[in-house]
């Protein structure tokens, strides 16, 4: 057994001390004590057991120490594991929060990106709107420039039109002055044919002029006395009541206008029409031809019927019904404040006198129709209007002969007056009624016959335009047809020559009545035969009025 034991290799390699012990001791002992007895063998085995026990105890202690170390390490590792787990949880929370914030920031970024896209689209639309506004501004600038140019052109046009209006105003003033200078355009009116108010105004005017000239008693006016148109113009220029269609002065406490609007109603019926009876307040014609109201005829002014107040008219009034004062006649209406013209201008009074002289011929149309004249050259028909022609035969004979020359003269005179703007010739400028030099001679001749002062009344005044005379006229006058139509001479010398023989007739027969006929020897041979068309060119534009006037027996300018 011993020889075979060392020869065997152990199963595993033992530690060095064990190998040394096992190899050295038993081998040496076996080699040295091979012949040992059993007792020695037992002793050696016991020692080996004790040594093994000692080694086992040390190994156990080491194992326990290692176990304790392992437990301590395990506790430390568990602590570290818990800490690492806590840290992991913290990290997980942080990661979760970071992830949430990231998603939130991502959503915010998406929203911001959408807003940026919308802002970009809005900016594009804004840019387009800005470009459009700039284009509109440029267009408006161009329009402003064009409108400014148009305004400048309009201003220049307005200035030119104002200059033309000024020229036309001056031309109208010149035309009115020419019409006023040419006294043969208007006929004289009988004192009895004038309206009552106009008779009172003429009587006051003549009485005031006579009192200023001589303090003696003023002569009375005869019904057949002839009132020149210039006297009517002078009377109507005075600031008195100009309401010929009202018995009361509706403008007594108000300032009067310089010019009034004359409306001639040409749409009424025949004066003798039974459909238009006299109104209660109409005046009754007196035997001497003068007009008196009903209150004055009865002798009680308190019993006068109230008349309607004066109604102001627009510049183009509608025709009114027949007035109670003048039933069946042409109503002349006035407006005091529609036409305002400066006080210095000669246009208002002249225009008013011209229209009044024309319209007065329409007022007495009723009396002309009431007495038809068998003789074609009666004064009523001869004095109906400046263009009255008693029979159509002289018109057909004289008008074609002088129509060409009169039209040419008209064109030449109007071109010279209004186009070339040349002053009127001396012969036309001197066509006034009576000058200052003619008044003393007429006073001297008419002062010899005191019996005729009821018929012949002079109108003295400080101005030459007011120094005209009221002359009588009778039916059987020896006028030529042209003089009978126009009834006024051209120059003051011819007027004086036509008026002076009347004084001689009154001196020869002072006791004769004013109803006797007197011949007025006018120098008709020295005057050229003129055509009635020299009145003006208005007949070319008022054909309806001309036709109606020809049918009624009156020619209206």
Curated annotation (Swiss-Prot):
Residues 394-405 have a biased composition (Low complexity). This is Tight junction-associated protein 1. The modification Phosphoserine is found at residues 300, 320, 345, 491, 545. The modification N-acetylthreonine is found at residue 2. Residues 530-542 have a biased composition (Basic residues). Keywords: Acetylation, Cell junction, Cell membrane, Coiled coil, Golgi apparatus, Membrane, Phosphoprotein, Tight junction. Plays a role in regulating the structure of the Golgi apparatus. Residues 378-388, 546-557 have a biased composition (Polar residues). It comes from Homo sapiens (Human). Residues 42-171 form a coiled coil. Residues 1-37, 266-303, 309-328, 364-409, 439-557 are annotated as: Disordered. The keyword Membrane applies.
């Amino acid at each position: 057994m011993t020889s075979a034991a060392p020869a065997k290799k152990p199963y595993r390699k033992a530690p060095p001390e064990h190998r040394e012990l096992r190899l050295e001791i038993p081998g040496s002992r076996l080699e040295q004590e091979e012949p040992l007895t059993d007792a020695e063998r037992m002793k050696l085995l016991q020692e080996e057991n004790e040594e093994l026990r000692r080694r086992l105890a040390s190994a156990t202690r080491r194992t326990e120490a290692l176990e304790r170390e392992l437990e301590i390490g395990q506790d430390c590792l568990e602590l570290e594991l818990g800490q690492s787990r806590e840290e992991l949880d913290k990290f997980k929370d942080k990661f979760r929060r970071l992830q949430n914030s990231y998603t939130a920031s991502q959503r915010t970024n998406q929203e911001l990106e959408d807003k940026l896209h919308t802002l970009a689209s809005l900016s594009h639309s804004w840019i387009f709107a800005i470009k459009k506004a700039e284009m509109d501004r440029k267009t408006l600038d161009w329009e402003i420039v064009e409108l400014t140019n148009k305004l400048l052109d309009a201003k220049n046009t307005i200035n030119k039109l104002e200059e033309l209006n000024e020229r036309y105003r001056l031309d109208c003033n010149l035309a009115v002055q020419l019409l006023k200078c040419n006294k043969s355009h208007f006929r004289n009116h009988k004192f009895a044919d004038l309206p009552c108010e106009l008779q009172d105004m003429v009587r006051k005017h003549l009485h005031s002029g006579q009192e200023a000239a001589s303090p003696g008693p003023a002569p009375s006016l005869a019904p057949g006395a002839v009132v020149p148109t210039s006297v009517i113009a002078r009377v109507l220029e005075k600031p008195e009541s100009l309401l010929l269609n009202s018995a009361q002065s509706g403008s007594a406490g108000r300032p009067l206008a310089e010019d009034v609007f004359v409306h001639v109603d040409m749409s009424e019926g025949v004066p003798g029409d039974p459909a238009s009876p006299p109104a209660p307040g109409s005046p009754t014609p007196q035997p001497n031809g003068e007009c008196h109201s009903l209150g004055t005829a009865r002798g009680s002014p308190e019993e006068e019927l109230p008349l309607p107040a004066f109604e102001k008219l627009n510049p183009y009034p509608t025709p009114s019904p027949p007035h109670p004062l003048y039933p069946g006649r042409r109503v002349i209406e006035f407006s005091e404040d529609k036409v305002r013209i400066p006080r210095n201008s000669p246009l208002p009074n002249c225009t008013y006198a011209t229209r009044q002289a024309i319209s007065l011929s329409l007022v007495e149309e009723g009396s002309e129709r009431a007495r038809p004249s068998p003789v074609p050259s009666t004064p009523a028909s001869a004095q109906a209007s400046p263009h009255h022609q008693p029979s159509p035969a002289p018109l057909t004979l004289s008008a074609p002969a002088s129509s060409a020359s009169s039209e040419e003269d008209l064109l030449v005179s109007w071109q010279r007056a209004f186009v070339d703007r040349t002053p009127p010739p001396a012969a036309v400028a001197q066509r006034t009624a009576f000058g200052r030099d003619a008044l003393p001679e007429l006073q001297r001749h008419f002062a010899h016959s005191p019996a005729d002062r009821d018929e012949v009344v002079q109108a003295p005044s400080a101005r030459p335009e007011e120094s005209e005379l009221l002359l009588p006229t009778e039916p059987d006058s020896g006028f030529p047809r042209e003089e009978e139509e126009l009834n006024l001479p051209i120059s003051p010398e011819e007027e004086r020559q036509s008026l002076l023989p009347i004084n001689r007739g009154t001196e020869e027969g002072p006791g004769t009545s004013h109803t006797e006929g007197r011949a007025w020897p006018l120098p008709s041979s020295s005057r050229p035969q003129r055509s009635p068309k020299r009145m003006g060119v208005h007949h070319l534009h008022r054909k309806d009025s001309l036709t109606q006037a020809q049918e009624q027996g009156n020619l209206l300018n």
